[in-house]
């Protein structure tokens, strides 16, 4: 779990760490951040929450109980970014809420229990979307794309075995991502028939 403000100030790299997979850039500029993939993040809530507290656009989030992520805290709020639907323009929205979580999984659990709106990666909520536990808050595709990176020390400061493990790990992650993106769920279902 990232420390408070790590998303905006950069993530600390522990001395006993060889590789750190993160959506936040490193705080120390002497570290390397190798791009792995991008993923979309948007707002989700339970149908029950949305029936009681309707929302249609990100600028309405200020009137809702948003489930905050500790690493994204600025004072008593999070800044959630969304691309303006149909454009590449990005806008920031300051959101507040009754709950602060140190990871997305606990934030998702609160949202599943009708306690607010969660800002989560689309891949993290696929099963919730399929079974109707969570639904997107917006009809239009308001989302924010984040980079997933592997952070490590420059190669000249690493033992050979760490370089080897890092190269193999990144190769395998990229290979699995490429495979998962080749077959969308509906294609996978068709190929099983």
Could you describe each region identified by the protein language model?
Residues 1-29:
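Central regulatory/effector-binding core of bacterial HTH transcription factors
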Residues 6, 23-25, 45-47, 103-104, ...:
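Beta->alpha turn/N-cap motifs
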Residues 11-13, 32-35, 57-59, 71-72, ...:
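Short secondary-structure boundary/capping segments
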Residues 15-20, 41, 112-117:
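Alpha-to-beta junction loops
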Residues 30-41, 45-71:
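Flexible hinge/capping segments at coil-to-helix
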Residues 65-88:
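Secondary-structure junction motif
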Residues 89-136, 141-143, 158, 162, ...:
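Hydrophobic hinge/microswitch elements
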Residues 122-131, 140-193:
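C-terminal effector-binding regulatory domain of bacterial HTH transcription factors
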């Amino acid at each position: 779990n990232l420390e408070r403000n790590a998303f905006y100030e950069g993530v600390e790299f522990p001395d006993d760490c060889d590789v750190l997979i993160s959506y936040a850039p490193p705080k120390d500029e002497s570290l390397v951040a190798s791009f792995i993939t991008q993923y979309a993040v948007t707002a989700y809530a339970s149908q029950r929450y949305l029936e009681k507290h309707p929302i249609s656009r990100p600028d309405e989030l200020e009137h809702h109980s948003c489930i905050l992520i500790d690493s994204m805290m600025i004072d008593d709020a999070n800044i959630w970014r969304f691309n303006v639907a149909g454009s590449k323009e990005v806008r920031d929205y300051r959101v507040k809420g009754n709950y602060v979580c140190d990871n997305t999984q606990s934030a998702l659990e609160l949202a599943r229990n009708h306690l607010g709106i969660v800002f989560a990666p689309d891949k993290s909520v696929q099963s919730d979307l399929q079974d109707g536990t969570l639904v997107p808050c917006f009809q239009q595709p308001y989302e924010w794309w984040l980079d997933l990176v592997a952070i490590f020390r420059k190669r000249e400061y690493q033992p050979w075995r760490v370089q080897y493990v890092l190269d193999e790990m990144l190769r395998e992650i990229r290979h699995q991502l490429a495979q998962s993106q080749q077959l969308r769920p509906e294609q996978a279902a068709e190929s099983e028939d």
